[in-house]
Structures are given as C-alpha cells and as structure tokens.
Amino acid sequence: MSLTANDESPKPKKNALLKNLEIDDLIHSQFVRSDTNGHRTTRRLFNSDASISHRIRGSVRSDKGLNKIKKGLISQQSKLASENSSQNIVNRDNKMGAVSFPIIEPNIEVSEELKVRIKYDSIKFFNFERLISKSSVIAPLVNKNITSSGPLIGFQRRVNRLKQTWDLATENMEYPYSSDNTPFRDNDSWQWYVPYGGTIKKMKDFSTKRTLPTWEDKIKFLTFLENSKSATYINGNVSLCNHNETDQENEDRKKRKGKVPRIKNKVWFSQIEYIVLRNYEIKPWYTSPFPEHINQNKMVFICEFCLKYMTSRYTFYRHQLKCLTFKPPGNEIYRDGKLSVWEIDGRENVLYCQNLCLLAKCFINSKTLYYDVEPFIFYILTEREDTENHPYQNAAKFHFVGYFSKEKFNSNDYNLSCILTLPIYQRKGYGQFLMEFSYLLSRKESKFGTPEKPLSDLGLLTYRTFWKIKCAEVLLKLRDSARRRSNNKNEDTFQQVSLNDIAKLTGMIPTDVVFGLEQLQVLYRHKTRSLSSLDDFNYIIKIDSWNRIENIYKTWSSKNYPRVKYDKLLWEPIILGPSFGINGMMNLEPTALADEALTNETMAPVISNNTHIENYNNSRAHNKRRRRRRRSSEHKTSKLHVNNIIEPEVPATDFFEDTVSSLTEYMCDYKNTNNDRLIYQAEKRVLESIHDRKGIPRSKFSTETHWELCFTIKNSETPLGNHAARRNDTGISSLEQDEVENDVDTELYVGENAKEDEDEDEDFTLDDDIEDEQISEENDEEEDTYEEDSDDDEDGKRKGQEQDENDIESHIRKERVRKRRKITLIEDDEE
C-alpha cells in the first residue's frame, strides 16, 4: 500500500489474511489532519496554540498516476509531500529495497498506545528470491555460463550436469514459476484444486505450484553446500588434527587382518576415538563407561575446569564462553609458583569426582570404581595461568594436570589408590610430584604409606624410579651427616642403620625401601657356614662407589622436575566421624605405628581404636533398659546392693574430650611457624638415634667372599656361585669383589644384630620361617596317613601311592631348597 498526504483519496481496501497485523508507529507526518472519528492520536505539539487541533494519521490513496502500488514495495510520497516533510516521511530506496524511518523531533510526544495497521503481502514484501539472486555468489552463475576446456570437477561439474538434465540454455535463464492464475485443464475438477471444500477461495492462498524446486534452486543449494563445508568441520563432530599416519596405518592393517568382533553388549561398546581437552585431541587408551549416547560418538569434548563432557563442538564452544569455574572445587592446600594442589571430598562434590573417574578410566585399565566416589578423597594438581591483560577476564585459570585419590579409611596404610597424569603433561615429572606429595601427607599423619596394589604398567615404572631416587637421597643425607660427626667417632666402626630408619626418613614402608635399595644395587646378604638358626643371615648396605650414587641423583635433578616443598603445605589430617566420611560403620584396628605415635610426644596422637565409642553406646543402652524396668515396676524404687553400682550416662562433652577435641587442639597449635614441626622433628630425631647407636667393628666384615646381591628371583635352584652372574627383572647386577673391597670404608651395616631397638624391626622380616614349614610338613604327613587308612579300593590305593610319591619328591625338593637357604626378599609383581 502507499502512505500519502492526500486526505481526499479513498481508504485502502482491507486484506482478509493480514487484517490483524499491527506494528509500532514509527512514521510521522504533519500533513495528515484529524478525522472526525479520531481513533488514533499520533502526537501532541508542545507550546502550541489551542486553535490547532490534534492531528490523526490517515491511510489514504493519492492520485493513481503519481502513486502506483508496486508489488512487494511501499510506494513513495509525492514530490510535494516529500519537499514539505523531508525529515518525517519514510525514505524509500528502490534499488536497495530498504525502508529508513526518520528521527522523532524533541517537541513531539508519541503516544505509547498508538498502533498503525500496515497491510501488505508478506511473500511479496520479503522477496528472498530477489535478495538471493542479487548476491555475489549466485549472480555469476545465473548470468554466465560455466565452461572450461579441461574436465570439470566438484561444484562446476554438478552445475553443468543440472543444466544438461533440465535442457536449459544460458541465455534463456528465467524464473520458470508459473502464474497462480493458470487455467485448469479440461479434465481437472474444482474439487482437486480447492481444499477444504472451498473454504479458502483465493487460489494464491492454497496453490502449491511454487513449491517444486527448479534448476535455480538446486544451483543455490549446491552453492550454499559448497560454502558451508568449512562450517561442518568447525561445528561438526570430526577431527581437526593431523594425527600420526603410522598409527593410522597400523590400525587399518589390524582391521583388515583381524576378524570383525561381534558386539555382545552394545551399551558398553564405545566408539570414542578422540577426547578433546584444552584444544588437544587425545586418543584414549582404554574404553570408559560413559553414558550410551556419549559412547556412540567419535569425539567427546571435555571442559578442563568442570570436567563436563559434551558431544558437539558448538556446544563445547558455547560452554567455554559461559563456564565460570576456572578452578577445581574444594580447598587449595598447596601452592608453589604455578603449581597448586586441591583437596576435594568425594561426598561433597559427587558430580565432579564422577566425571574425573570417567576421564581417568580412558587411561587406566585397572580402574573399577567410577560412580561410587564417596569413600575417597581426591587431590588435583593444576597449573595456574594468569590473565591480567585480558580485557574481559581478570581471574586466574587453573588448568587440570593430573590427580591421585586415596581412601578416607583403610587398614593397610594405603596413601594412594589411583594416580593419573594426562598424556599432554607427561614426561615433565608431575607423576613423581604426586607420589612425593602422597608420602608427604602420610608423614603428616605420622604413619608409613604405600600405593594400593596392583599397580598399572606406567605406575609401576614410575614408582620404581621414585623409590630409587628417594633411597639415593636418603643415603647421601646419611653420608653427609656422618661426615659432620666423624671427628668425634672412631673410624674403625660402621654405623647401624635399620630399614625402619630409612622408612621414617622417606615415609615409605620397609618393603618399598627394599625395592629402592635393590634398584641402587647396594643391598647385600651374607651366608655363614652354620645353618642352625636365622641369626646367621645378616643384610648390609654396601656402597661400592659414592660417585655412582651421586651421578644417579644428579642425573635426575638435572631434569629440573618440580619438587615438593614441605613449608608450602597448609594441611592437617582430616578428622573423620564414626562413619569415616561415608554412611557405613567401620572398626578401627590399632597398628604398631599408631601405638608408637601415642607413646611419642613429638608425634601427633592417633585414635587407635573405638573403645570410647563402644563405651558410650553401651552406657546409653544400659540406661535405656534401666528406664524401661523403672516404668514397668510402676515407679517402685529398686533396692540397690552395696556392690551394685550403676554408671551414670556419659555426656557428649566427656566423649569428645579425650579424642577429637585433644587432637584438634594439637593440630591448631601453630607456635613453631618457621618449619613443619612434625616432619623436621621426626627427621632430626631419626638422625640423632642413628648417630647415638654403638658402631660395629670392621673386623667382623673383613671377609668379603660370602656377600651377594639380594635378588628377587623366586624358587631358583641354581648354585650360589652363579647368582652373582645373573640379573633379575628389575635390572640389578652383581658387583665385582675388587670394587667392594676397595670401598669397605663406606659401608652401612643393616641387620638383626645391628638393631639397638629390636621392636622397631620386628614388623619387617626377610627370612623364611622354618617352624611354619615343619608344621605344614607334619600336617601333610597326617593327611597322607589318613588317606591311606580310609581308601579301601584298589583305585584309591593307587591314587594314594601316586600322591605319596609326589609328596616324597616335593619333600626332597623342599629339603634341597632349605639347605641352599634361598631367601626371597620380594615376591614377583604378578603374585
């Protein structure tokens, strides 16, 4: 329709379909006078005369010769109207097809309730066909023939194929839409073309002739498809990195050679090929039990801050813009430079810990717990990234590096249950950093620690290296302390060092200490002529060359791996309630180290058992029974004997007085703020006890012919002379006797005879128990005699004889082994 300033023109004709369309009034004209009805008031003039009446906008039609209605357009005003109201009337650009509205003058107030009805054909007004055809991509295809001398490929080939199929020439390219007023054929009837029984009378409202795609539509579709290929890589679930070609070839070769596996359980079958984390595409080593709709995708996108997993790159991009958790939940207990360690309780942050376990299962095959995270505590290692110069963000980002978890309560002194370092952060020393941090927490708790068995392949290799380096560090520390005090001591004696001393200095259990000493090739055993008792077997630490130990430690230190600093730790042991952090009741068993901690004043007190809890519960139950008897006896006073004393109910304050409260007061005592009172005092006490012990004369170890390296080979029947020439699975080799004799002065003696306090080393034994073997042999003989008496049949006798022969052979074999006195220090990894 047209908006003009001629009041004499008739009103426009109403449109049946668009009669209810209403838009806001953005068109103002000072030439439209008020109507007698006065339905809508457009504006009120400020500081105007009373004689000037309010003007009302009217939709009128001007001269047909000047203002013709164009299809899909809003006609312009007449020249006279445009000259008088150049600022207030709509400005229309025929070429661009755009409508620009004027700026409202400050002296005009527009009513908020005013609405203007503009009636137009939406299909003609929003002519998308015209807009697309004028674009820079479609216009050359419509106006120019695409031909080339060479063979056509890709998009051009598809376009020419369409032209040949439709049999169209370049010069005859016109829009082939047929008119809506095309007459019907003779055999057509009105019922087939007028739907709903003639309810919609106009043909343009129900005609479907323009819905069929034409050759121009197909060309446009192909053009848009060609231009949107780049967006499919960005927004699609496809890989954007060039991975190693050799790995891909090996996988393809395995697929061709191997048979296609049958999928028995489709729910647990994972099709995940890569995990996107921090703009890295990481190939998982093992399958993880993600939800079924996640495992059906080839790419999984994981946020490095909240560990939320997604299957769409676009969703992942939008999540990165909106995610505000730039650090893990929980408490930050350690910070040294850019490294931080966070403590997270599995009961408080269940969703985060579950996502963490699902991510860890992609790289740890032995992990079995994914959703039951309440009994565990997680320690997250992060790298801090400062964003001070960022215009929209000032908070620092903490990138996820790795983690380790441990149980809140365990009776085996496990300080680590699961450990993971992401592949993009490996070979940087973060794995050993987490291991050392776990031992630091164990030393703060005044107990030894060890990882939970069995270990994975990478975990076992990393722990062996860690134990080796820690033992080398302790030996060098003992050497330096011995040299400082060598002036006051006799040089003809050796220092007495027990495995328990090294365990206290490192926080490791004695078994792990033996592993480390074997890796350093310094643990030897001595075999005397007498085989009467276990006292004939002594174990010593023989250092062939201190330069070799120093080179091992310096080689590792030269890599500049991060080290744990004790003074950066702000943490105290967690005080667990009766449920130990979970919803179950467990019984605490006292350990030797806990008893030692209770008797030692410098060590933190440890709650060794739950006797207070049992006494408290028993007293409450006893008082309840007493009240019930009193009620049943109709409030009669009971006669109490002199010896019959009823203990009063224990209040809650007395219950917590000797357990939790005293432990809390001890932990909150920060008088010594210079260094950690527990760790440094424990090391100082151990070193002083070593120096105060009586030395062993060198004459006792003058002969060096019977000293051998301790091996981990089990059930070996080779002669003792050949043991020195063999190597075990941990890479331990024998040393020549000349090298040992040259460096006798640097020996550290370890053995049962060298213990000043025998109770310290009773928990760790390296010898076989002969009494247990004798008892087991007697039991076997009794079982054999019982079987001979009970078997009456010939088959039974024959079986009994065969068993007797086997038992005799095994008994002879055991005697041979006992004569050779093969002592197994450490069992194999598989066992």
Swiss-Prot record:
Biased segments, Basic and acidic residues type: 795-812
Chain ranges of the MYST-type HAT domain: 267-573
Region spans: Disordered: 614-639, 719-813
Bias (Acidic residues) ranges: 736-746, 755-794
N6-acetyllysine modified-residue sites: K367
Positions bound to acetyl-CoA: I419, L420, T421, Q426, R427, K428, G429, Y430, G431, Q432, S456
Zn-finger (C2HC MYST-type) residues: 300-325
Domain of life: Eukaryota
Pfam family membership, one: MOZ_SAS
Effect seen on changing C303A: Greatly diminishes HAT activity
Cellular compartments annotated: Nucleus
Family matches, as PROSITE patterns: MYST_HAT
Regions of compositional bias (Basic residues) in chain numbering: 621-633
CC annotations in GO: chromatin; chromosome, telomeric region; NuA3 histone acetyltransferase complex; NuA3a histone acetyltransferase complex; NuA3b histone acetyltransferase complex; nucleus
GO molecular function, one term: histone acetyltransferase activity
Matching InterPro entries: Acyl_CoA_acyltransferase, HAT_MYST-type, MYST_HAT, WH-like_DNA-bd_sf, Zf-MYST
EC id: 2.3.1.48
GO biological process terms, semicolon-separated: DNA-templated transcription; regulation of transcription by RNA polymerase II; silent mating-type cassette heterochromatin formation; subtelomeric heterochromatin formation
Family, as annotated: Belongs to the MYST (SAS/MOZ) family.
Protein name, as recorded: Histone acetyltransferase SAS3
Biological source species: Saccharomyces cerevisiae (strain ATCC 204508 / S288c) (Baker's yeast)
Gene: SAS3
